[in-house]
Structures are given as structure tokens and as C-alpha cells.
């Protein structure tokens, strides 16, 4: 009996230690931001030397992240209606060459994936989803902008443009971009950003699609359902292509801030 009691006591003493063990696979991730060149790049890839410098700048960032014990890089792959990989759907972001659609002479996403993997880090394609940029940005994209190619799924709001989450073709358009990335690149994950309506969007111009697809739901619930459906559709689409690719999203970080969104 004493022996049994000692065994039980030993087990109970170990339980708190087991509860405090870190997860087997801890994610230590950092964003590498390309929009406005906030993190990268500083140099334009317009010459062979420019290409080498631009690549070296990214390598320097990855080396620092590796030294700081990060194991996951969220590499900005789509910004606002433009991209940082060779796409048949949207143009290259001008930050690479100084020109909208300008070919940088290499594939930034392929390069980022290869360099991350050399350092034992995962590379996730970070894709901004719903926002398409302000009027100036959209005008600069010209006929390459999705607002010109697929105006039915785009909505102007407060001097900016957005994909309309309530239009059924929006999730299909986003999936076409995701499909390019997942099928053609050895990414370890896809990370969705701004997968939500814009702030204070009570007057967001989606009344037509609401009347057509609302099916009796109140506006707020319908909008929530739209976002849920897009997330579900993209998640299932990724898993159907490559089940091992991780899917994540960047939601609003503070609960008290959620009132700003419909």
C-alpha cells in the first residue's frame, strides 16, 4: 500500500512539469514586408548588379532571423493587387524594379523559399487578400488591375478599392492566386492578411450583392458568413492541392478593436 501511495505521489508531482513543457514544434515567425520597401528591398533590380544587391539584402535579413532563432518567415507575396512572384494573373509590384509589372530578372518568391530552406526555416507566402490599394495605386496598375479586369468583384470605398467579400467570384479569384503559389512553389504555408471588411464599413457598397445573396440574413451576419466562407474555401483549396501546406491568417489582434469592423 505504501509503495502504491509513493507511485501515485510521484505521478502527481510530475504532472505540473509535463504541463509546462514547450510544444514539440514551436512557431517563431517574422514578417518580411515588401510594401513600400519597409523591410525589403532597398535596391531596384534593373541591372545584374541591382539583382545581386536586392538578393543580398534579403539574405542579410534571413541570416539575422536565423541567428535570432526564428524558424518561420512570412514572406510578402501579394500586396494590393500586385505580387512578388511570376504570376499569370497579377503584375509584379513596382517596388522590385521601380516600374509596375517590371520583371526583376529572377523570381523573388522562389529565391526566398530556397534561401529559407537553406537555413532550415519554413517559408510561408504572405498574401494580402481584400484591399486593392488607393486610387493612385490602382491607376498606376492600369489595365493590369483587377478593378479593370474583373470590375464586378471590386468595390470603391473611401478613396480605396477592395474585393467584394459578398460576391461568389471573389473567393474563386483569390483561390486562383493561391493555386499559382501552392502548385508552383515549395512553400511551407500560406498566410492570409486583411481577410476582412474595411474599418467602419457600414456604408460599404455591397447592397446589390446583399440583396442578391443575403438569403434573409441581416447584413452583419451575412458579412461574417462571407468571410467565413472565403476562409473555408481557401483552406480546403490549399489542402486539396498539398495537404501538408499550412494555412494561417492575421486577424484583428485586440478584441476591443473588433467594433471597428462589420
Place the predicted regions along the sequence by residue:
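Solvent-exposed loop/turn segments at secondary-structure junctions
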Residues: 35-38, 79-83, 129-133, 196-198, ...
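Bacterial Sec-dependent N-terminal signal peptides
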Residues: 1-20
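Aromatic- and glycine-enriched glycan-recognition loops and surfaces
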Residues: 47-68, 95-119, 225-233
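Polysaccharide-binding and catalytic clefts of secreted carbohydrate-active enzymes
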Residues: 70-71, 119, 144, 148-262
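Active-site-adjacent "subsite" loops/lids of carbohydrate-active enzymes
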Residues: 25, 33-56, 114, 125-184
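Aromatic-lined carbohydrate-binding/catalytic grooves of carbohydrate-active enzymes
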Residues: 68-104
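Catalytic domains of carbohydrate-active enzymes, especially glycoside hydrolases
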Residues: 53-82, 184-187
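Glycine-rich, aromatic-flanked loop segments that form ligand/cofactor-binding clefts
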Residues: 22-30, 70-81, 107-154, 191-193, ...
